Swiss-Prot record:
HAMAP family (UniProt xref): URO_D
E.C. number: 4.1.1.37
Single GO term (MF): uroporphyrinogen decarboxylase activity
Biological source species: Rhodococcus opacus (strain B4)
Cell compartments where the protein resides: Cytoplasm
UniProt-recorded name of the protein: Uroporphyrinogen decarboxylase
Subunit and partners: Homodimer.
Protein's job: Catalyzes the decarboxylation of four acetate groups of uroporphyrinogen-III to yield coproporphyrinogen-III.
Family: Belongs to the uroporphyrinogen decarboxylase family.
Length: 355
């Protein structure tokens, strides 16, 4: 993956608040969007997805476009995020997996040895052509709203492949990491290649920013993260740097890893709800923007409680800016919960924009 990709000219969106905040410029208003904003919280999403499997949906460009647009139309958020799933590039490459309702991704043949790693198929851009087509449809429809592309980080993809599905303790993943570092690094190197190819395909198609989701990194100690994960995430960010778009790095439960995650090369570090943004800024260090960090569960507590927490978070974000953070993008500290009232999200957008 040493050959640098080339990217066609993309949309010029000088006034987009999200891009301004991510790039260290002064936005016209505080930008806000939500992880998992296109999803089960929206009745129009549930209707259009009825009877259609998750992975099938992710490879239908017109459907991806419509689902991605739904929260932009409804909530007035400052960014769209491509409707997809972190295992899409694995499926596209030919790995036998499915997304099982109520469980998540399930892998038919878990990876447990160096031979298993060697047998993994490599992703080529043509295999995610449907995703690229969806990006092109979206950039034609979004107007001045930026489109965020995304991928799963090598560690999180590795956990799914090693465990065979979601895991509470990641015991097989950690066992492989510690008992057979050679196989571990070979696996993450292969998955970094997959992630890079997937992101480059989205960037060539015209996404305006990218986010790397390391959903399970919070299961690691700082020492484990630095030794077994950071070099591979660094390579992902380095390989897409030439696209010159904002790069966001996010993981759940990663308060103790924020400094190292900031070192990986992103322009923006996502923060979950467990740590105040001004504290996060000190851990990340100056020169990075921050994204976050309302607890998704607070949206069930009523408008007064939401407003109280939003005012706290924006004050902490302003303190982070004073301490050297280069921008703030308001978001939740994790994805929108399925039973969230869509009206609460719309009201949250209006509140953030009013402050």
């Amino acid at each position: 993956m040493s050959e640098r990709a080339t990217y066609a000219a993309r949309r010029v969106l000088p006034d987009a608040p999200l891009l301004a905040a991510a790039e260290g410029r002064a936005p016209g208003r505080r930008p806000v969007w939500f992880m998992r904003q296109a999803g089960r919280s929206l009745p129009e999403y549930r209707e259009i997805r009825s009877g259609i499997g998750m992975l099938e949906s992710c490879f239908d460009p017109a459907l991806v476009c419509e689902i991605t647009m739904q929260p932009v139309r409804r909530h007035g958020v400052d960014a769209a995020i491509l409707f997809s799933d972190i295992v899409v590039p694995l499926k596209a490459a030919g790995i036998d997996l499915d997304i099982v309702a109520g469980t998540g991704p399930v892998v038919a043949n878990p990876v447990r040895s160096i031979a298993d790693v060697a047998a993994l198929p490599r992703l080529v851009p043509e295999e995610v052509g449907a995703v690229a087509q969806a990006v092109q449809l979206l950039t034609a429809e979004l107007g001045s709203t930026p489109l965020i592309g995304f991928a799963g980080a090598p560690f999180t993809l590795a956990s799914y492949l090693v465990e065979g599905g979601p895991s509470r303790n990641h015991e097989r993943t950690k066992a492989l990491m510690h008992s057979d570092p050679k196989t571990w690094h070979a696996l993450l190197g292969t998955l970094a290649d997959t992630t890079i190819t997937f992101l480059q395909a989205q960037l060539r198609a015209g996404v305006d920013a990218i986010q790397l989701f390391d959903s399970w990194a919070g299961a690691l100690s700082l020492a484990e993260y630095r030794e077994f994960v950071l070099p591979h995430s660094e390579r992902v960010f380095a390989e897409v740097e030439s696209a010159k778009v904002p790069r966001i790095h996010f993981g759940v439960g990663t308060g103790e890893l924020l400094g190292a995650m900031g070192e990986a090369g992103a322009d923006v570090v996502g923060v979950d709800w467990r740590i105040p943004l001004d504290v996060a800024a000190r851990r990340v260090g100056p020169g990075k923007a921050l994204q976050g960090n309302l607890d998704p569960a607070v949206l069930f507590a009523g408008s007064a409680a939401v407003e109280k927490q939003v005012r706290r978070i924006t004050a902490e974000a302003d303190a982070a800016l004073a301490a050297g953070a280069t921008g703030h993008i308001f978001n939740l500290g994790h994805g929108v919960l399925p039973d969230t009232d869509p009206g609460a999200l719309t009201a949250l957008v209006e509140l953030v924009h009013s402050l």
